[in-house]
Each structure stands twice: as structure tokens, then as C-alpha cells.
């Protein structure tokens, strides 16, 4: 777990010093690509009146995006890097951001949120992404009452490099079936990405 944090810090913290715009700090291809990932969430999930947790919130850009849409919801963001959270508060002082490793020790209660959103957390190749993803699923679903939404890189539409990690859609769907009976896969918004939108089972695996 500490190796993952070190890898993430080594990759993203230099970008904090180099760039001022959130999508560049988070190593997205462009602002448009970042926004299109957010649009998948807002176009497919009714967020009005909901409590949402943004896992891997970075500099809080989803908070700013949702504010611009005037969606009435309770937003919370958490990131493993404290420097990201410091920057998030600089940009969005009215946001609710937390620094911590939710996969190791969560500061939140079970089923505290209606919707869990996680964008880009699994993109960087950490050497054990499959294990990390399997560990993350029960964390996602234990904190959500209604829906879990996350995106992953698609190996079929991208020149693969060792820097990033790509997931097989069929394998992801197989893993998630124990947590959800209603799963939607969204593709086509950008070539190298897919988003999973999963309803939360009332009875979760122990």
C-alpha cells in the first residue's frame, strides 16, 4: 500500500509544481477529456439531493464542475496526497476535501454516501493494479447506498505503454457482478476509456 502511495506521489506531485490547471496536474490528455469523464457521471446518474464521495478527487475539479452546473448535492472529496487537498482548498475554499487513504483506513461511515465516483485512480501502472482494483471494489460498495461509478483505461483503443494500466471490460464486469445486479458500461465518449455505473446490491458479500 505504501509503495502505491509512493508511486502516485512521485508521478503527480511534480505536476503540482509544474502546472496550475487541474487536468494537467492530474495528467489528463486535455480539459475536454476530463470534462467528458465528468459528463458520463452527470448524464447517467441523478445527483440532485444526493451525497457524493469523489475518491481520488485530486484538486477538486469535479466539485467545480458540479457547481457550474448548479446541481444541488452534498459533495465530499478524498485524495491520498495531502498536497492535492491543499491545492483543492486553494481553488475551492468552500469544498469539503479530506486527505487520507480510504482503502487502508476510511474516515467515513459505511453507507454514508448515495453515490461513489472514482475517476483515473487505476490509470497509473503501480505494478499490482489488478490486486488494487479487487481490493477497492468492496470499499466502493461498502460506502455507497445507491450507485458506484468509476472509469478505467480501455486496452483496445490506445497505444499501450508501461506507464499506464489497461483493464479488460469483460473481466471487470465479471468481478463486479458479486456487488451489483444492474451494471451499465458507457463507452464512446473518448476512445481510450470506459465507465462502469453499478447499482448497489442490498445484500453485499461479506
Where are these regions (language model features)?
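N-terminal, positively charged/glycine-rich alpha-helical extensions of SAM-dependent methyltransferases
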Residues: 1-21
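Conserved alpha-helix/loop element of class I SAM-dependent methyltransferases that forms part
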Residues: 31-48
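Class I SAM-dependent methyltransferase SAM/SAH-binding core
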Residues: 53, 59-105
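A short acidic, Gly/Pro-enriched loop at the edge of an enzyme's catalytic core
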Residues: 108-115
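A short SAM/SAH-binding and catalytic strip from SAM-dependent methyltransferases
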Residues: 115-128
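A short, conserved alpha-helix within the catalytic core of class I
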Residues: 125-137
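Conserved beta-strand signature within the Rossmann-like core of class I S-adenosyl-L-methionine
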Residues: 144-153
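Class I S-adenosyl-L-methionine
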Residues: 160-206
Amino acid at each position: 500500500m505504501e509503495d502505491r502511495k509512493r508511486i502516485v506521489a512521485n508521478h503527480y506531485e511534480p505536476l503540482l509544481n509544474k502546472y496550475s490547471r487541474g487536468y494537467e496536474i492530474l495528467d489528463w490528455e486535455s480539459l475536454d477529456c476530463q470534462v467528458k469523464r465528468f459528463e458520463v457521471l452527470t448524464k447517467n446518474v441523478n445527483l440532485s439531493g444526493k451525497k457524493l464521495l469523489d475518491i481520488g478527487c485530486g484538486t477538486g475539479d469535479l466539485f467545480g464542475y458540479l457547481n457550474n452546473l448548479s446541481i444541488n448535492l452534498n459533495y465530499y472529496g478524498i485524495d491520498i496526497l495531502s498536497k492535492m487537498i491543499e491545492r483543492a482548498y486553494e481553488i475551492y475554499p468552500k469544498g469539503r476535501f479530506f486527505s487520507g487513504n480510504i482503502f487502508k483506513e476510511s474516515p467515513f461511515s459505511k453507507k454514508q454516501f448515495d453515490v461513489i465516483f472514482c475517476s483515473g485512480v487505476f490509470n497509473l501502472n503501480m505494478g499490482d493494479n489488478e490486486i488494487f482494483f479487487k481490493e477497492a471494489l468492496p470499499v466502493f460498495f461498502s460506502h455507497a447506498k445507491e450507485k458506484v461509478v468509476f472509469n478505467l483505461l480501455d486496452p483496445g483503443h490506445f497505444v499501450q505503454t508501461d506507464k499506464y494500466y489497461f483493464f479488460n471490460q469483460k473481466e471487470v464486469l465479471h468481478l463486479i457482478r458479486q456487488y451489483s445486479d444492474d451494471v451499465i458500461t458507457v463507452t464512446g465518449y473518448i476512445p481510450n476509456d470506459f465507465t462502469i455505473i453499478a447499482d448497489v446490491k442490498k445484500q453485499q458479500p461479506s
